[in-house]
Amino acid sequence: MNDAQPYMLKNGMCLTNEEDIAIFELLLDQQPHCNVNYLWNDIGLGNLFAECFSGTHRFCVDNQKWYIYNRGIWKVDKGDIQAQGNMQRLLQLLHLYCTEVNADAETIKNYKTYISKSSSDTILRRALNASKNNLVINLTDFDSDPYLLNCRNGVYDMREQKFRFATPEDYFTLSVTCDYPTGINVRQCDRWYSFVDEIMEGDKEKAAFLQRALGYSLLGVNREECMFLAYGRTRSGKGTLFNTIAKVLGMGTDNGYGGSINSSLVCESKFKDKDYNAPEPMLADTVGIRYLTLSETKKGALLDVNAIKSLTGRDPRKTRQLHCPAFTFTPQFTMWLSTNFLPKVNDDTLFKSDRLWVIEFNKHFDGDDRDYSLKEIFEHPDNQAVILKWLLDGYKMYVADGLNPPSCVKEATARYARINDRILCFKEDCLEDAPGERISNGLLYSKYKEWCEDEERGYNPVGSTTFYTEMERFYKRSRSHSIGYFNGVRLKIDAE
């Protein structure tokens, strides 16, 4: 900033930069040439640097990077270029300080010699390194208030539903890509509203739920402990919708609330580490992310229910950046999986605990239905602010009504649960009701294992105890001569 009143020095020079003037006045106040807090060595210079730049510099111990504050956001100082430049800037201001301060000539002469020697690259780096302890911050200290949303022109407080200006103490490293929409007329982007109506096929309840769910995803805490699965064939509008939301929330920039990650995070794999307490590097880049999209799952993929429960359940997780120490953080994000193929699930507690909600996208755009101008329309800065307002309105709807899934979402989720209820599927494929008949436990379980291990299915069968407990949903059990039976059932002829 260069709008400060010029500061005239005794030697005739003039300081015009506001930050330079503030630092220079601090030097005059602190008198570093005779202050025991700023000894004439690397540590003393480091302490002085920390004092002068305490409002704009932090060193993060978790990723070993400097962060510099500028206009509402803390940004990583790549290669320490700005931090080193500001150390040199401090030395230049110290030279000017020597011409301004009242002190005996011999002391100032020696102090100027010390300053000149400190300008060498080696001493400069050592002094900068010494300053770190006074400017330390943890990665989890950034973007830590889940109810503050940083915009280009200020901060939206989601608790108070009020807008204010940002301060360095907010410790934002993330921001949406547009201004907070003050006084915007929603008719300014009719196309967004008509687009949502089209992809929801005029279903007002489903469209309202979609808006509530996406507005809820602006929060930096997954209070509902759930994720969302958007399911539908290609050209259903899913990609345009979620890419637009991601763009508004800053995905693809270095400092956005939107992020993406490989769906292997929530899918089973024989190569996957099952120790959920082990550091997981994949998660390191999700710290602070609120809206997290997962890459589309492959056909036949199996969801890792334990991973989903941990990630949605706000369990502390360990992660680390490359060549950096591990640290613990609590995921803030809400996950969105958009897919053409429903992944398999082998644990129905995922559904019983309402960890997942399915939103079906049944519209198919083809031929004349396709609007190739949508991307360009929605990426216009004015329209992005309108879309942000739509998201904030969705959040307000969530605050007023909760997620409150409509019947269409509950039914879609129930259908998904049903096709993944393998015990029920086995029953429907292989068994039929037969009053007066019975099947022994051993025979029934062996048929179940055969059914699971069929090449077309490739399921891992549950243990016998779990199987018998699940089968009691359908048939009563009895014992005769130490043999257990299920009553009122027989194998279908083609299953024998």
Regions from the PLM with identified roles:
Residues 1-24, 64-97, 428:
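Modules that initiate DNA replication and primer synthesis
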Residues 13-65, 95-496:
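Feature primarily recognizes SF3-like P-loop helicase cores of small DNA viruses
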